[in-house]
């Protein structure tokens, strides 16, 4: 979150009032749980109510530590209380499934936490949309060494959540695991994927962002014709010493730092925000760095 987001919001509202453009409406996606405890909360309270998404990402504090999101359940519930007091009557929570070390307890925790958020304001439960997205390990992150869940595992986890979602206050929505598999292959692939991408296009894969037009079988044909195994790219856990297809790209953060963070994540150790704790030696220039 931008730490001074309330400044541009105030300026935007002033400009709209000055130019007689009417009331300001702002949608705030994927905010940290404590974002509304202060000036930002007071600022958005004066605006037309639109969508607000909080992103706990995981159903348990244990798994949030694994992904270095040190957000307590109580801080999330307090954020919900503040939003309800400010006038919101529905919230959206963003979660991921398929994260490293994830267990059934973590999946159950998604619905438990969402149910608590729905009732955080006291009285009648408020509507909470539970948005589920499969985790995709991305390059230049500590999880670039992790393997992605298979399509079958992801589909089973979505089915598990659907079968357990019997709270009328909750609306469960999910990202299609099939498109996530494709995203995982493309995100972690190398130059050998280029002919497969061209072949998939020739087979009709053009508007795959639209679910009604997406067909994973076209991509499977393209991968097979190119002699490629999607498991090799998406699902395989990578060795720490493996040379990655993107290693030649310098994004500033060192691979050694990412590897340390990968080890810490598996141990559930949280790395503090360098803006608070000081330079952590990631490789990017910052105040206090040597």
Outline where the language-model segments fall:
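Flexible glycine/acidic-rich beta-alpha junction loops that bind and position SAM and/or redox cofactors
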Residues: 36-40, 61-67, 97-105, 123-152, ...
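Active-site-adjacent "gating/activation" loops or surface patches in catalytic cores
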Residues: 42-54, 58, 62
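Conserved C-terminal portion of the radical SAM core fold
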Residues: 29, 51-52, 56, 70-141, ...
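Short, glycine-/Ser/Thr-/acidic-enriched flexible segments
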Residues: 31-35, 57-60, 97-98, 135-137, ...
């Amino acid at each position: 979150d931008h730490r001074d987001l309330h400044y541009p919001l105030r300026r935007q509202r002033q400009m709209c009032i000055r130019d007689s453009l009417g009331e300001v409406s702002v949608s705030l996606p994927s905010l940290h749980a404590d974002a509304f405890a202060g000036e930002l909360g007071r600022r958005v309270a004066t605006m037309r109510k639109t969508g607000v998404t909080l992103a706990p990402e995981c159903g348990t504090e244990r798994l949030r530590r694994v992904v270095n999101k040190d957000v307590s359940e109580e801080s999330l519930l307090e954020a919900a209380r503040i939003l309800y007091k400010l006038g919101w009557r529905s919230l959206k929570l963003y979660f991921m499934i398929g994260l490293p070390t994830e267990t059934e307890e973590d999946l159950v925790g998604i619905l438990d936490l969402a149910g608590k958020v729905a009732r955080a304001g006291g009285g009648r439960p408020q509507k909470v949309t539970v948005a589920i997205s499969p985790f995709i390990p991305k390059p230049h992150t500590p999880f670039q060494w992790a393997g992605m869940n298979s399509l079958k595992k992801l589909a089973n986890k979505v089915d598990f959540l659907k079968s357990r979602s019997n709270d009328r206050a909750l609306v469960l929505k999910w990202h299609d695991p099939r498109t996530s598999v494709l995203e995982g292959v493309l995100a972690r692939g190398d130059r050998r994927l280029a002919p497969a991408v061209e072949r998939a296009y020739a087979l009709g894969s053009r508007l795959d962002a639209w679910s009604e037009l997406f067909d994973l079988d076209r991509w499977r044909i393209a991968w097979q014709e190119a002699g490629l195994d999607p498991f090799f790219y998406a699902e395989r856990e990578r060795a720490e010493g493996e040379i990655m297809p993107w290693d030649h790209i310098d994004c500033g953060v060192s691979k050694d730092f990412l590897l340390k963070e990968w080890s810490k994540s598996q141990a559930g150790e949280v790395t503090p925000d360098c803006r608070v704790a000081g330079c952590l030696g990631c490789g990017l220039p910052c105040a206090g760095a040597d």
